[in-house]
């Protein structure tokens, strides 16, 4: 793909919310490498400083601007931020895993609505992409075969999240899943009913891995895996997480960039499901890479995720950026070890 064939013009300006996050930083870096300008939202001046330094170090001649947005629900917060923006990647989200849906889901839906309403008023905006999650489509399963497509929604999590109080801590995962589903649903409702001039798409990443972009980052899913590699005796979280699909963070970034820029990618839910894994899959890769470490034995109780997807559009997008398919599981896992 060349920038000249993009919906966003050469040197065009893309807003990336949550640019300091694991996925957000990779999206911003990929856009800068392609010659786009990037405006990224952060919550504090400290975060603005380190993310600007990290991105400009990799792209010395790039045009990156950090904008402080401490509260996405503040009235009028988006108007100035969106000035002259060609595309929006809305990556920022609540990752507190809080159990109270009124404190997690309700303000997140409102924040998205405010951003979309402001974007509708900005004539330069051509594309809007929301970073959703596989959990917006369905819970993980090792017993039921579930076909995931653009019409699949995690109604099970939504129902569980909104059960009456008390809001027990164990509800946090259902609330997170419902959050992603309900915010994404609101984006599609807005597009359908409000009919903005811009095209909307969403990207649904699964368990995302790769090198943490900067040492200042929490690292998200990659950090969990890195901690296990550094100390194999602390295997409780990765063992307990069990099975899902993985995806390399660089591939997730390319799907976002394709959703922002490719003419033919319109009104799509892009399913970033590269391949299945379970706890034993990590062990196989890490034993091969460093057999000297005291890796635990394989867990015979570990099954594999039984969800299925059809990833034709996703593979097409990767091909436009010169990639012949998803980054392999082994390569993706080993990239985590390149983290600062």
From Swiss-Prot:
Location(s), subcellular: Membrane
Residues linked to a glycan: 139
Induction note: Expression is under the control of the terrein cluster-specific transcription factor terR.
Gene3D superfamilies xrefs: NAD(P)-binding Rossmann-like Domain
Keyword hit for Cell division: no
GO molecular-function term, one example from the UniProt record: oxidoreductase activity, acting on the CH-OH group of donors, NAD or NADP as acceptor
UniProt entry keywords in alphabetical sequence: Glycoprotein, Membrane, Oxidoreductase, Transmembrane, Transmembrane helix
GO cellular component: membrane
Annotated TM spans: 7-27
Enzyme Commission number(s): 1.1.1.-
Membrane topology annotation: Single-pass membrane protein
Primary location recorded for the protein, binned into one broad class: membrane
Residues annotated as binding NADP(+): 176
Keyword Transport set for record: no
Gene null: resulting phenotype: Reduces, but does not abolish, the production of terrein.
Family: Belongs to the NAD(P)-dependent epimerase/dehydratase family. Dihydroflavonol-4-reductase subfamily.
Cited PANTHER family: ALDEHYDE REDUCTASE II (AFU_ORTHOLOGUE AFUA_1G11360), NAD DEPENDENT EPIMERASE/DEHYDRATASE
Function description: NAD-dependent epimerase/dehydratase; part of the gene cluster that mediates the biosynthesis of terrein, a fungal metabolite with ecological, antimicrobial, antiproliferative, and antioxidative activities. The first step in the pathway is performed by the polyketide synthase terA that produces 4-hydroxy-6-methylpyranon (4-HMP), orsellinic acid (OA), and 2,3-dehydro-6-hydroxymellein (2,3-dehydro-6-HM) by condensing acetyl-CoA with two, three, or four malonyl-CoA units, respectively. 4-HMP and OA are not pathway intermediates, but are rather shunt or side products.
Name recorded for this polypeptide: NAD-dependent epimerase/dehydratase terH
């Amino acid at each position: 793909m060349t920038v000249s064939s993009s919906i966003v013009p050469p040197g065009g300006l893309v807003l990336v919310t949550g640019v300091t996050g694991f996925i957000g930083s990779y999206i911003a870096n990929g856009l800068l490498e392609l010659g786009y300008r990037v405006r990224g939202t952060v919550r504090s001046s400290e975060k603005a400083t380190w993310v600007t330094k990290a991105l400009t170090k990799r792209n010395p001649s790039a045009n990156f601007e950090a904008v402080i947005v401490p509260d996405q629900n503040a009235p009028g917060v988006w108007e100035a931020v969106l000035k002259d923006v060609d595309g929006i990647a809305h990556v920022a989200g609540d990752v507190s895993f809080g159990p109270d849906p009124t404190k997690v889901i309700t303000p997140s839906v409102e924040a998205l609505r405010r951003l979309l309403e402001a974007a509708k008023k900005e004539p330069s905006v051509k594309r809007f992409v929301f970073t959703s999650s596989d959990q917006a489509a369905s819970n993980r399963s090792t017993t039921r075969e579930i076909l995931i497509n653009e019409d699949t929604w995690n109604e099970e999590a939504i129902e569980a999240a909104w059960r009456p109080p008390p809001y027990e801590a164990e509800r946090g995962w259902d609330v997170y899943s419902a959050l992603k589903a309900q915010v994404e649903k609101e984006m599609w409702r807005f597009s359908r009913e409000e009919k903005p001039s811009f095209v909307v798409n969403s990207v649904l990443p699964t368990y995302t891995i790769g090198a943490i972009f900067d040492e200042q980052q929490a690292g998200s899913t990659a950090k969990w895996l890195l901690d296990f590699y550094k100390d194999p005796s602390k295997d409780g979280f990765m063992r307990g997480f069990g099975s899902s699909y993985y995806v390399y963070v660089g591939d997730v970034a390319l799907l976002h960039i394709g959703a922002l820029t490719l003419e033919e990618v319109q009104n799509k839910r892009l399913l970033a499901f590269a391949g299945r894994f379970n706890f034993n899959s990590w062990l196989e890769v890490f034993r091969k890479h460093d057999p000297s470490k005291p890796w635990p034995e394989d867990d015979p109780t570990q099954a594999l995720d039984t969800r299925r997807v059809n990833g034709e559009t996703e593979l097409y997008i990767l091909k436009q950026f010169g990639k012949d398919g998803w980054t392999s599981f082994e390569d993706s896992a080993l990239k985590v070890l390149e983290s600062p």
